[in-house]
Amino acid sequence: GSEMCIRDRGAQSVNPDVKVSVVWTNTWYDPGKEVDATNTLIGQGCDILTHHTDSTAVPATAESRGVKVISYHSAMTKTAPKQLIGAVTHHWDEYYAHRIQALYDGKWKVEPVWGGAEMHMVRLSAITPDAPKSVVEDINSVYSKMEKKEFNVFSGPIVDNEGKVQIPEGKVADDKMLNTMNYFVKGVIGKVPTGK
C-alpha cells in the first residue's frame, strides 16, 4: 500500500479527483503478466501508467499503445522514448560505499534501511522535456524538501479509500506502519490483497 500512497498523493496534489487503478501481477518479474496488466489498465481508460515490477514490459507496452508511462527502477528511455514522462530510479551506490567504509572502519552493524530522498537512494529522473518549466520546478522543489526532511508524503492526515483516517493530522507514518500498510489511500480503487 505504501507505494500506491506515494503515487496517489502526488497525483492528488495536482488533481484532487484523480483515480488510481491497480492490477496485481503477484510477482516481481513476469513480462507476460506485466503486458496483460498494462493492457487491462489501458482498456479501463487509464491515461498514465506506472509499475512496481522489474522488467521493461510495462513501458514497452505503453510505448507501443501510445500511453504515457512512469518507469520504475531505471529510466528506460530507450524502451519508451516517446511515452516516458519520468522515472522513479534507485541509486544504491552511495549507500553501499558508506556501508563498505563502515565495515573497513569496524563500525558495520546490521540495521534496516529505508533510504529515500534524504539518502539520495530514490530519485525522479528522465522527466520529459515536454514538461512545462513550472512543473519541473515544482517537482524539484518537493524533492529538495524531501532531501532536507522538510516534507514527508506519509504525513497525516491520510485517509484510506473507505474514508477512515489512518494517519491523523500532525502524525507521520513510521517504518513499522509503512511495512504493515494494508490499505489504499483515498483515490485508489480496490483493496490490498490479504494473501488468504
Q: Which residues fall in each region the model found?
A:
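Short, small-residue-biased leader/transition segments that mark boundaries at the very start
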Residues: 1-6
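Extracytosolic ligand-binding ectodomains
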Residues: 9-22, 26-32, 39-48, 60-69, ...
